[in-house]
A protein has these predicted regions:
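Alpha-helical transmembrane segments and membrane-interface helix-loop junctions
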Residues: 1-271
Length: 271
């Protein structure tokens, strides 16, 4: 329930970011100001509500924004690790674990949108203008957030041929080396593109340019930089958390899912 509430509040706040921009940091350029104002007026879900604090963001916008960190904290401290997940987790992993639950909610939301579009298109012959682009938009966040969650779960693809053949101290050296390279990559990516992303794309609220016209460039590109920073931080936390673990030898048997095999046996037996 908490991940669902977080997704609802975050979705509302993201959709109404132009209201926050116009309230907190309006553009000095009259042309850009008029453009963002027009976007806000055309996309505002509650146009009848007056703005607060001398701006255009209304009470619902501010309430959604205020509830995001509240649901984040509640979700972090109420998350429970499933049996199939990485068991050697620590308190610092709670953010990634909760984002994993949020990602699952986004997948459900994306599936519902696709099913709704299929029903309208083929049953009623009345397709929507927004379902495909909304699916692309949600899918972008799913891809990014799952990368953050996957880093915490140690589920990214790794080649263990050399790693398993060396001693534990040398394994730690490899861990530090690849983590350092990844942190450097994240740093230079953010350093080299933050102005292009946060000023040109986000602050000017660049839209997708279609009939539905979602703000995919204005939201996905900043999310890329934010998530890459979180993934880099999580990579460092993983090295620290796994420092004293015993060496783990990986074999082909690790890829075998015993529960799945038993389920197949039961299915064949029932047939």
């Amino acid at each position: 329930m908490i991940p669902f509430c977080f997704v609802v509040c975050a979705s509302w706040a993201i959709w109404h970011i132009p209201a926050y921009i116009l309230t907190l940091a309006p553009h000095a350029n009259p042309s850009t100001l008029a453009q963002v104002t027009a976007i806000h007026e055309s996309k505002d879900v509650t146009p009848g509500l007056p703005g607060l604090f001398g701006g255009v963001a209304d009470v619902v916008d501010w309430l959604a924004l205020a509830l995001i960190p509240i649901f984040l904290v509640i979700g972090m401290f109420s998350v429970r690790v499933a049996q199939m997940e990485f068991q050697h987790w620590r308190s610092v992993d709670r953010v990634a674990l909760f984002i994993g639950r949020v990602t699952m909610m986004l997948i459900i939301s994306m599936t519902c949108v696709m099913l709704y579009e299929v029903f309208l298109r083929y049953a009623l012959e009345a397709p929507t203008l927004w379902a495909n682009e909304l699916t692309l938009w949600i899918g972008g966040f799913v891809f990014l957030c799952s990368g953050f969650y996957g880093m915490q779960q140690r589920s990214h693809i790794r080649i263990f041929l050399l790693y398993d053949a060396v001693s534990r101290p040398l394994q730690r050296t490899f861990d530090v080396l690849w983590t350092t390279l990844f942190v450097l990559f994240a740093f230079f990516l953010v350093f080299g593109s933050y102005r292009q992303v946060f000023v040109i794309k986000f602050y000017n609220w660049e839209m997708f340019g279609t009939a539905f016209d979602p703000p995919i460039p204005a939201t996905i590109q900043p999310a890329v930089l934010i998530i890459i920073v979180l993934v880099a931080i999580q990579a460092v936390l993983n090295v620290i958390s796994d420092w004293n673990l015993e060496p783990e030898i990986h074999t082909a048997a690790d890829d075998i899912d015993g529960d799945e095999i038993e389920a197949i046996k039961r299915t064949v037996g029932d047939g």
